[in-house]
Amino acid sequence: MQGKNLTRRTVLTMASGAAVAGILSPARAQQVPWSTGAEPAKTKAPPNATDCHHHIYSSRFPVDPKAVLRPGDALVADYRLLQKRIGTTRNVVVQPSTYGINNTGLIEALTEFGSAARGVAVVQPTVSDEELKALHAAGVRGIRFNILTPGGATSVEMVEPLAKRIAGMGWHLQFHVGPDFILANKDLLNNVPCPVVFDHMAHIPASSGTRHPAFTAVVDLLQKGKGWVKLSGAYMESKVGSPTYSDISGIAQAYVEAAPEQLVWGSDWPHPTEKSDNKPDDAVLFDLLAQWVPDQAIRNRILVDNPARLYDFS
């Protein structure tokens, strides 16, 4: 009888210990599609933390014939797993070049996400006022010019006419461009009647860093309150790579020092520029922000307050 009691007691103790361990130890997040690793981020996200740059892909929507990037499905349900892993609760869905000016998938994703999401669309000057109003009602607050990716549906000639169309709506212009574009179009960027937002730290090369004249041009826009930068895509220009991306840190930290009130953060999930067997670890990318911005109050500003202002979150 005593042997049986000991066995039962041992089993109960083991079960209890396992339950306590499950409560006290960090939960292992479910594997997120298009992301390396499964551990949660070490940095605690504040309430209403916002991922200001990600995409949604679905094979249900027609691909633009000129599109170069054609990832597999990366759905709303998949992205929610990423939110659970890193702790963000608000998000900005960016129309990818894959679908050109067909924003149907973007609108569907915004509807599924609900009021905690905003969007950035891709349009051309022929877009009607009714279409712009419908996009606004769906949660869109900006339009994107992807000049860097071949086969994009937009061009520099479209910037001025579209800027005039959206300025009164409280929208912004989002630019996926390189340093050469920034330097060649400084007057345009300064004079358009709405804010300008640069994807992925404006693609400043790690080799030149803050010495690059395009960095100076971007900082000038930030300090005027005209420009914004997304602290995202560290892997795009880094030669050092994961987990430190140390050759990019100086650029990110210099942006923070220059104008923390004009910065937002983004994951760039599902990382369409990266091969499927070389996706970054999204928890590592989120934790980078704490290294770049050790001051929690400033970090919260970048994750919560700045996005609320730029994307009209109430």
What are the functions of these language-model segments?
Residues 65-113:
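Alpha-helical scaffold segments that flank or form the walls of functional sites
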Residues 31-32, 98-181, 187-190, 230-242:
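Active-site gating/metal-coordination segments in enzymes
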